[in-house]
């Protein structure tokens, strides 16, 4: 077997492996859910700004994520409709919750901002950041 053919076979096998790994981790229609261990201070800070700004999240969940008459608190480990995992928070911000005021992409936030808001909520609810 020639060297070129071996390289072609190896690169094809690697490409297939990457595609399969991606397919196994793709938890949303938009690609793989980032791992919560990869959260950075910059992501959390950006998410905080969106949560309290354009996302309008604090209008229902409160300035300190303490909840209110129409939305639950997001500060503890007790969750009303989800398990509090990073992927579940992403899904909720991305898809909303039918029959409630929680709409998909609150405040018209963009897809990339969904992950940032989820980073902030996850970090606060897991004691990694302050509201």
Report each predicted region and the residues it spans.
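Residue-level recognition of specific faces of alpha-helices
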Residues: 53-59, 73, 101
